[in-house]
């Protein structure tokens, strides 16, 4: 019985130290940066409530990643020599819609929460696969009667 209690105690202590390490691992480094395959964004938030802290951090990261996508898509859209002012405006609206739609598919790849002085601070990193975002943008453009005739897909893909 003594051995059983000792083993349970030892398992508890080792489990707690592993849990503490997992909770204090920073969400930094190249593994959490945007690369050729993924758009990634990080954010931090603080609140008196742990859930509110996480929600605020995810919302801030979502905003950051949608801004990245918009900037990349607008830069790639400059490759479209056939777009006039009306098409640019329509394209911008389409990008806005696609980024909102894709932001619903965010994946949290790192989350770190800690508490100090009665407040919770949460760091998160979210990601979206670039290939999926590009595919959604292209499919939306191809489904638009006005834009599909002017759209130069290969130039857009190369610039994206």
Protein language model regions, located:
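Bacterial N-terminal signal peptides
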Residues: 7-17
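Domain-level marker for long, solvent-exposed, non-transmembrane regions
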Residues: 22-160
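Positively charged n-region of N-terminal signal peptides that target proteins for export
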Residues: 1-5
């Amino acid at each position: 019985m003594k051995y059983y209690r000792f083993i349970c105690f030892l398992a508890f202590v080792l489990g707690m130290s592993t849990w503490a390490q997992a909770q204090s691992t920073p969400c930094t480094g190249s593994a959490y940066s945007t690369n050729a395959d993924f758009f990634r964004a990080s954010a931090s938030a603080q609140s008196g409530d742990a859930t509110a802290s996480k929600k605020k951090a995810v919302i801030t990261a979502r905003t950051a990643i949608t801004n990245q996508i918009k900037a990349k898509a607008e830069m790639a859209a400059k490759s479209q020599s056939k777009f006039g002012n009306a098409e640019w405006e329509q394209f911008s609206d389409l990008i806005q819609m696609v980024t909102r739609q894709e932001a619903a598919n965010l994946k949290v790849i790192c989350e770190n929460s800690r508490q100090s002085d009665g407040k919770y601070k949460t760091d998160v990193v979210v990601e979206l696969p670039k290939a999926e975002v590009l595919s959604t943008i292209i499919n939306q453009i191809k489904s638009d009667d006005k834009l599909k005739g002017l759209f130069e897909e290969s130039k857009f893909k190369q610039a994206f």
